[in-house]
Amino acid sequence: MNTGGRLIAGSHNRNEFVLINADDTARIRSAEELSGQTCKICRDEIELTDNGEPFIACNECAFPTCRPCYEYERREGNQACPQCGTRYKRIKGSPRVEGDEEDDDIDDLEHEFYGMDPEHVTEAALYYMRLNTGRGTDEVSHLYSASPGSEVPLLTYCDEDSDMYSDRHALIVPPSTGLGNRVHHVPFTDSFASIHTRPMVPQKDLTVYGYGSVAWKDRMEVWKKQQIEKLQVVKNERVNDGDGDGFIVDELDDPGLPMMDEGRQPLSRKLPIRSSRINPYRMLIFCRLAILGLFFHYRILHPVNDAFGLWLTSVICEIWFAVSWILDQFPKWYPIERETYLDRLSLRYEKEGKPSELAPVDVFVSTVDPLKEPPLITANTVLSILAVDYPVEKVACYVSDDGAAMLTFEALSYTAEFARKWVPFCKKFSIEPRAPEWYFSQKMDYLKHKVDPAFVMERRAMKRDYEEFKVKINALVSVSQKVPEDGWTMQDGTPWPGNNVRDHPGMIQVFLGHSGVCDMDGNELPRLVYVSREKRPGFDHHKKAGAMNSLIRVSAVLSNAPYLLNVDCDHYINNSKAIREAMCFMMDPQSGKKICYVQFPQRFDGIDRHDRYSNRNVVFFDINMKGLDGIQGPIYVGTGCVFRRQALYGFDAPKKKQPPGRTCNCWPKWCCLCCGMRKKKTGKVKDNQRKKPKETSKQIHALEHIEEGLQVTNAENNSETAQLKLEKKFGQSPVLVASTLLLNGGVPSNVNPASLLRESIQVISCGYEEKTEWGKEIGWIYGSVTEDILTGFKMHCHGWRSVYCMPKRAAFKGSAPINLSDRLHQVLRWALGSVEIFLSRHCPIWYGYGGGLKWLERFSYINSVVYPWTSLPLLVYCSLPAICLLTGKFIVPEISNYAGILFLLMFMSIAVTGILEMQWGKIGIDDWWRNEQFWVIGGVSSHLFALFQGLLKVLAGVSTNFTVTSKAADDGEFSELYIFKWTSLLIPPTTLLIINIVGVIVGVSDAINNGYDSWGPLFGRLFFALWVIVHLYPFLKGLLGKQDRVPTIILVWSILLASILTLLWVRVNPFVSKDGPVLEICGLDCLK
């Protein structure tokens, strides 16, 4: 039969045939065919208009679309561009559809109402059926009769049946198409019936399937094969000019294959939690809310008349706990995870043979007291930064020494010297981690995946060099213990400027960088800068926040990188690709422009296996932060965070431009509520926007016009006004002001380094921030010892969003205070900062409305500043069990069956919620339970003290000293865990623990001697008391210490409290019968 060189394949069950191209000329498209622009919907070549130009459907974004797909979208779809959403306008040669303007100025009556070509209709319909599941084929089926000239014999069981005419054929190819690669399946019908046609997948090249009678078995493999073949053709394509000379076309510039190239694909993606895990969790939250409603309905309507005070107190505490749970729960509604593609980042910004286009990064390291923050730990952090897997010319490390200690200065000089050996060793053998202390101390097979024979020898030599380096640092620490009476002097005999910590000038020293110092292999090293800001009496230095703002200004003058990484001195880089992970979000062309910072989770070394004080804080970092990432992003936690410099400067997030003429979003269309008011409203909004532009935009655009030399009216006046406003905002440094306008960062290449150093000294002077917006709207925000929460909150109020990045290998690791006292002091400082924010004008309950802060994100910030106030009801609630056992009263009446079921459902909902959180958060039950225990321990100790200290500081002006958490050196595994340090924070939990234990003894004794009418109340009171004791068990274990011996001070407190409880015991007198006769009067005759 005459098939035109094509293969006919059939299916007996489906009663249809498929026509497949099988000739050699159609196997691979030629380079000339691929060079034309193709439709992104059906992959057909876009036709040319009458004037010879390609057909353009969307005038806003020029998304490649052929005319048939354009006409189908206007008639059957949303009438909008798939890429930008702009409503399609009628183009000459296309029919009019509902919604077109009557006065479109197109004189095209012959095409205004004509029908579409059926073959294109079926292709567009099939594509949109795949995108919009649920549409029936009847919406896109079109009728046309067969042509008598297209006679193809019917192939029946491999035999040609010439007795059947063309109007009875199952396969009909219309002669009007002229396209050999178009196939239409038609069910068997008679000559008088209309025929429904449908093509094969339009974008598929059918020749990739080869010969045979079977269609594809694995679509994915065929699709991959097709993409590889097309990409190979494009790579080998040569485009000739008029003289015949050709040049290789860069495949990255081919508009027909934007997503085929790996380097043009997104650098990251969101991974929502599986619905099988998150949907039951969401349903349970609603169930728990319903159970809470029933619970409070029962509690309020069933008071305890003989213990009304206990009942009322317990109900108030329970209501507060419910509100606190709601504030903590709903920000977890939409948790997500993220995945980065480092290979795509390299393909896009690190092309072979060209300089790296990755953005520069300035890294900030802050330290205060070298006695509490050992210099060896700080040196390891700096070494891990200098050896990071990032272009060396793009990295600058700034170390802020807020204590102006010569010990830190000398330790950095030794660190810079050792870095010349350590950095090339790390990059040569790709070792992890790149902090030498933790690399050499890790217990693992260091030869795994190492193939270089020289590795063992060089590792031994490097370990010996590092041990010598440690000896030098330890010698410095030993010498610094005895401070001379006249203070320290430098090598040239001049006094060290920082001998007086509270009164000294600013100091800047560049150890590495552009000074010509290279590593042992002759390669350039990243810049290393020592900074100690000026301090004078009478100036408020704002502690860590002020030091970080000084680093922002110094780095803006010296390097001005567009991105900043902030780490504490004890948080080293555990993953050398951590900065690249952050750049996958920051430098993403589509989603990166609105990201203000990328927050990494905190991971810790040196914590005991049981983590009795919940130092890892896994519940917060693996559950709460994932939930926030699905809303507007995680909060800033103070370290391990990559910032966008422009966001720290207080600028608003870029607004997404709404394309004009967008289609109405009302659904369904017959229920449109706009009523023609949409355009008017949009016009009013635009007028308001023109009347009230952003002040920062005015300033930036004014200075941009000046730099470009544009001659506009009153240019000089505008430039002076803008300059004055920027100086009022950023300070009197012209270099700093000019650097704020450079979105991509950088400093002029012809600037004298000496002049930059002089400018740097100026911007770290103690009076530079006066009458500026530093600490108010720019940089780290002042007003709280937890400046991290306040700084991230201000950015979110400006419309920015943040991102939570959790790479498989932890990006940063630090040391945590495993000692009980140090841990409680750390929690005290965090809670104190939250109280200060709550009592300030920046409280998220009333600040930031009308900005870009989302409601669920606001809930999370409210919870972060309200949680210290929970300590009051928590302390009272934990005291109630002992009071109930000592007095014989209870907070609930006699429990009925309904009440018993209600209480059981309440406890079950709490337990199941925790189990489901552990499931989608991927944490263990040990971590979850330790977090619950320390919530009680910290709530009745650190949070309580923070609440009173915050009230005294804000209301009475009584200042509290900021205590730096000590970072212990490696003197032995868990050596700090069992050291007992007395602090007043231990008093409240100790008291609660003892009175509840005594209460249990009293209750059991009372029950044994006098008996109970009902054992239910006794079990309820015992369960209540044991609940408190179990939660305080880690605290009790910490008090006992390593030797299981009670310290003397605790013994004294126990005796004092026991005396008080003994008096209560005598007052209660449980051995005396309350209802029966008095034994002293009755005597022994009563026993007869």
Swiss-Prot record:
Active site: D402, D788
Membrane topology qualifier: Multi-pass membrane protein
Cofactor note: Binds 2 Zn(2+) ions per subunit.
List of residues binding Zn(2+) 1: C39, C42, C66, C69
Location in or out of the cell: Cell membrane
Binding site for UDP-alpha-D-glucose: S366, K372, E373, D402, K543
Zinc finger (RING-type): 39-85
Protein keywords: Acetylation, Cell membrane, Cell wall biogenesis/degradation, Cellulose biosynthesis, Glycoprotein, Glycosyltransferase, Manganese, Membrane, Metal-binding, Transferase, Transmembrane, Transmembrane helix, Zinc, Zinc-finger
Xref: InterPro entries: Cellulose_synth, CES_Znf_RING, Nucleotide-diphossugar_trans, Znf_RING/FYVE/PHD
Single GO MF annotation: cellulose synthase (UDP-forming) activity
Pathway: Glycan metabolism; plant cellulose biosynthesis
Residues carrying N-acetylmethionine: M1
Cofactor: Mn(2+); Zn(2+)
The enzyme's E.C. designation: 2.4.1.12
Binding site for Zn(2+) 2: C58, C61, C81, C84
Similarity comment: Belongs to the glycosyltransferase 2 family. Plant cellulose synthase subfamily.
Protein name, as recorded: Probable cellulose synthase A catalytic subunit 9 [UDP-forming]
Species annotation: Arabidopsis thaliana
